[in-house]
Amino acid sequence: MPLNANFPSKNYDYDYDLQPCFFFLEEENFYHQQSRLQPPAPSEDIWKKFELLPTPPLSPSRRSSQSSLFPSTADQLEMVTEFLGGDMVNQSFICEADDEALLKSIVIQDCMWSGFSAAAKLEKVVSEKLASYQASRKESALSSSSPCQSQPPPSPLKSPSCHGSLSLGGTHRSSHGFLQDPSSDCVDPSVVFPYPLNDSISNASSPCQDLILETPPISSNSSSSESEEEPEDEDEDCDEEEEIDVVTVEKRQSASKRVESSSHSQPSRPHYSPLVLKRCHVPIHQHNYAASPSTKVDYVSSKRAKLESNIRVLKQISNNRKCASPRSSDSEENDKRKTHNVLERQRRNELKLSFFALRDQVPEVASNEKAPKVVILKKATEYAISLQEDERRLIRETEQLKYRKEQLKQRLQQLRNFV
């Protein structure tokens, strides 16, 4: 027969199933139903206005037998959570047991709005329920640590660790007698609450908690479905995962060995010393303006000799660079820059010498040793044009002379014939 949601049941375990869905028009009915289940606190109506949905439980309730007179530990825990709102108590279980200030913060909302009498009552109830819960936690931890130590350690990548393998017989037995078995024999509280509440519990079940912290908490559906699987499949999965780990470790070791071998083999290579380009001295000649005109021929010949020596040095440097070993990019750039500077100096010196030679050929600026390059070019152009005119004039004169010569030869021949 289905239970009616309007009337609360006598059994406390079915209260989560009786909570209706929250709709906009059913808000007053929902709060009215909660007031029937338990007496409201003085400030409960104020806090209900700020809530939307009831907080769901973290784990499914393990229902005890209806014939038992005394409720189990899980039932007492649910009574405390539902009496205090559920949300803040569940947050306090995650914290350490020594943090009593955080546990006392449960009654902060009632202390703000109501008097100290309600706060004292709530503190008393919470302290009693938490003391009983911690005692049951110690007993369950001691009982769960013994099968964990007897079993071999499973693979670290397998999420259902020793808590999931407490006893397969117990899980099958709980499926037959669901309402007759107590909750502590079926579910370990550390599966639902992965964080330890006491130092003694953490020390007792340290090898099991290390495996739990690596994976997220196991839900009730996943634990029940995994308990139905065969142990042979689990062993095969563990073996496959262990093989994968061994392969990865061997690959890492081989890679590290290769790096070490390469580091040892590097000093055996011949060390190539970088080629250093010697700076050749290219003299920047300044014209001796105070010298006499008779020294110009010697000056030009000495300049040509020095330029030839500089060209020889540059050829030697280029040959050495071709025969040298490869170098780094920085040294190559420096060498190229130095070579470019040397060649640029040589080009400038050759250009200056050519201007000096051109100036000596132009009669108008030959005596002016301080003549600028622009004046030298203009005078040289004019002098070239005048030379071309003289050449054409001389060509015409030679042609006239040739014609006159032919005429004289003919006259001489006529005179010889008359004689």
Swiss-Prot record:
Subcellular location: Nucleus
Chain location of the short sequence motif 9aaTAD per the record: 78-86
Keywords, sorted A to Z: Activator, DNA-binding, Nucleus, Transcription, Transcription regulation
GO terms assigned for molecular function: DNA-binding transcription factor activity, RNA polymerase II-specific; protein dimerization activity; RNA polymerase II cis-regulatory region sequence-specific DNA binding
PROSITE patterns reported for this sequence: BHLH (PS50888)
Keyword DNA-binding in annotation: yes
Bias (Polar residues) ranges: 319-328
Pfam families: HLH, Myc-LZ, Myc_N
Region span, Disordered: 141-166, 206-274, 319-344
Signal peptide: none
Domain bHLH residue range list: 335-387
Annotated InterPro entries: bHLH_dom, HLH_DNA-bd_sf, Myc-LZ, Myc_transcription_factors, Tscrpt_reg_Myc, Tscrpt_reg_Myc_N
Subunit structure: Efficient DNA binding requires dimerization with another bHLH protein. Binds DNA as a heterodimer with MAX.
Free-text domain note: The 9aaTAD motif is a transactivation domain present in a large number of yeast and animal transcription factors.
Name the record gives this protein: Transcriptional regulator Myc-A
Higher taxonomy: Eukaryota, Metazoa, Chordata, Craniata, Vertebrata
Gene giving rise to this polypeptide: myc-a
